[in-house]
Design a protein with these regions (language model features):
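Bacterial N-terminal signal peptides that target proteins for export
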Residues: 1-10
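Bacterial N-terminal signal peptides
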Residues: 9-20
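Boundary of Sec targeting at the N-terminus
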Residues: 24-26
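Pre-active-site segment of Zn-dependent metallo-hydrolases
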Residues: 43-83, 87-94, 117, 147-162, ...
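Active-site neighborhood of phospho(di)ester-bond hydrolases with catalytic His/Asp-centered motifs
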Residues: 49-51, 73-81, 101-104, 180-184, ...
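Active-site environment of divalent metal-dependent phosphoester hydrolases
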Residues: 56-57, 83-87, 107-110, 128-130, ...
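Binuclear metal-ion centers of metallo-dependent hydrolases, dominated by the metallo-beta-lactamase
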Residues: 100, 114-132, 220-272
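Active-site-proximal loop/helix segments of hydrolase catalytic cores
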Residues: 157-225
Length: 272
């Protein structure tokens, strides 16, 4: 939705007594919870959780290792099946009775294994768009990565590896038209430029740790040469010793002063 249309619609709703004053003034809040997990609060107060690896994540603030402390979750998004993105998602889905939106083949496996019922594991895929809440749209886009589901079979107590589908990133469009591109885990690919040209994200959540994803230099190239988005928050670094990339290295490679890097520590919030 165009931001001006959103403001006009909110003004009418307020004049009719349908929305409180704070709904118009509220900003987009983006809180980093470590790795690729974020708590995003939309302009009307809807809570979006992405890639929730919280309980075992060494970077997650202690309060959020208790899933109930996330509050009411309205939208739950998972980019792929690796445990550092998926681990706590089923529990959050059940706790809030909220669907877990994830790649279609991944959720087919989730249902087949009995991890979640079909109602909490809807299927969609790259280029597909869903509307999990009124005024909020989520589109799945390409990510250059892999995806499997590691699952402990309750009958045998053996660890098993199952199909995780194609990994994705998400374009999250909020009620006021603000667009967030959560890249998921990804390496460089040329269609990042297409994603930027077509969807025009206002904020990119970008992996920088390397080894499993882009490292600092590749991420800086993606930000400055392909995406050219006005705002970037770095993610997917610091939690795994194999992902050695640092925020300082990423900042050092960034050469475009028009792109603002928001240097969040786990638990900190950026407002837009």
């Amino acid at each position: 939705m165009n931001p001006r249309i959103f403001q006009w619609a909110l003004a009418i709703a307020m004049s009719c007594g349908l929305l409180p004053l704070q709904a118009l003034a509220q900003k987009v809040q983006v809180q980093w919870l470590g790795q690729s997990a974020f708590k995003i609060i939309s302009p009307t107060g809807k809570v979006i959780i992405t890639d929730p690896w919280l309980k075992a994540n060494p970077l997650t603030p202690p309060e959020f290792k208790i899933l109930e402390n996330l509050g009411k979750v309205d939208v739950l998004l998972v980019t792929h099946g690796h445990l550092d993105h998926f681990a706590d998602a089923p529990a959050i889905a059940k706790l809030n009775n909220v669907p877990m939106y994830a790649p279609g083949d991944m959720n087919a496996t989730v249902v087949a294994l009995g991890i979640l019922p079909p109602a909490l594991a809807p299927r969609f895929n790259k280029s597909g768009t869903v509307q999990p809440q009124p005024g909020i749209q989520v589109t799945a886009v390409h990510a250059e990565h892999s995806s499997v589901i590691n699952w402990k079979n309750p009958s045998t107590q053996q660890d098993e590896i199952h199909v995780g589908g194609e990994p994705v990133g998400f374009i999250i469009e909020l009620e006021n038209g603000f667009k967030i591109y959560h890249m998921g885990d990804t390496g460089l690919f040329g269609d990042m430029k297409f994603i930027a040209d077509y969807y025009k994200p206002d904020l990119v959540l970008m992996p920088i740790g390397g080894n499993f994803t882009m490292g600092p230099q590749e991420a800086a190239y993606a930000a400055t040469e392909l995406l050219k988005t006005p705002n970037v928050i770095a993610m997917h670094y610091g939690a795994n010793p194999l992902a050695k990339g640092t925020l300082a290295q990423f900042v050092g490679f960034m050469k475009n002063p028009q792109i603002k890097i928001h240097p969040l520590k786990p638990g900190e919030v950026a407002s837009f």
